[in-house]
């Protein structure tokens, strides 16, 4: 096994031979015949297609996307959202009922449940305008994209981080991570910017102004590892236990 992902009530694993194994609740990704799609069309089962040739899996809310070595995307699970009928993808990401296929030419294709994501031509146009998108992440009701020029594009619920990014997110960003309520971005100068509901880092702005080398998150908090070995955590402003700095 080279990768394993949770599906709420099930799990999906990718093996080194390119096969996929699932177990758990049948409707949340375990049964690969449930809401199964191949080449943009509904199929009875993906069992044979998942025996080999898979190079990446991505999953959210009981939905699974599997990227094959031929560039096609297979999908199955709880929501049953139809992926594009093309075979020129090199990466795939699933987040909050929305799906993003990264194509070989650098463009991004989106699909998912209407009203809960970027499944529209206007948002897809924004993602494909300007610099190439390197990464997309999702909070509970918002999304953020990191672009090749170090800028960040965000959309969705403003209280969950979907508001327009501030000027300090227009360049220099090298990583973004989500939690359920917002996002945090690591900049090339070692500083951190966070935004969205419950992700206010003003209380520790001095600790996060430099020296951060890695960001992590759980469902409601963020953690920053600093170059001196210390850790700074923050999150929902009502959760005072998450406002700490731990020395090395």
Question: At which residue positions do the language-model features occur?
Answer:
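Short, exposed beta-strand/loop patches in secreted or surface proteins that constitute
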Residues: 3, 12-13, 47-48, 55, ...
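Tandem repeat domain/solenoid detector
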Residues: 2-3, 16-19, 52-56, 69-72, ...
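Low-complexity/repetitive intrinsically disordered segments
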Residues: 1-5, 14, 232-234, 247-248
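Conserved core positions of repeat-based scaffolds
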Residues: 10-13, 22, 63-66, 75, ...
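Short glycine/serine- and acidic-residue-enriched loop/turn motifs that recur at repeat junctions
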Residues: 23-50, 76-86, 109-128, 155-169, ...
């Amino acid at each position: 096994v080279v990768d394993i992902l949770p599906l709420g009530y099930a799990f999906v694993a990718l093996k080194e031979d390119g096969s996929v194994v699932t177990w758990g609740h049948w409707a949340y990704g375990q049964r690969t015949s449930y809401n199964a799609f191949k080449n943009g069309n509904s199929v009875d089962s993906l069992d044979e297609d998942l025996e080999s040739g898979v190079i990446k899996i991505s999953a959210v809310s009981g939905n699974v996307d599997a990227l094959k070595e031929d560039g096609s995307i297979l999908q199955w699970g709880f929501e049953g959202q139809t992926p594009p009928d093309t075979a020129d993808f090199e990466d795939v990401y699933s987040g909050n009922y929305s799906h993003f296929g990264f194509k070989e030419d650098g463009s991004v294709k989106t699909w998912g449940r209407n009203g809960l994501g970027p499944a529209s031509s206007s948002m897809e146009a924004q993602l494909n305008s300007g610099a190439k998108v390197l990464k997309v992440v999702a909070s509970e009701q918002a999304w953020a994209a990191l672009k090749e020029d170090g800028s960040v594009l965000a959309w969705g619920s403003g209280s969950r981080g979907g508001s327009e990014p501030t000027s300090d997110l227009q360049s220099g960003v090298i990583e973004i991570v989500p939690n359920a309520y917002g996002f945090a971005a690591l900049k090339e100068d070692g500083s951190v910017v966070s935004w969205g509901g419950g992700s206010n880092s003003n209380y520790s702005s001095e600790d996060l102004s430099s020296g951060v080398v890695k960001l992590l998150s759980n469902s409601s908090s963020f953690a920053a590892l600093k170059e001196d070995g210390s850790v700074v955590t923050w999150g929902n402003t009502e959760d005072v236990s998450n406002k700490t700095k731990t020395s090395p």
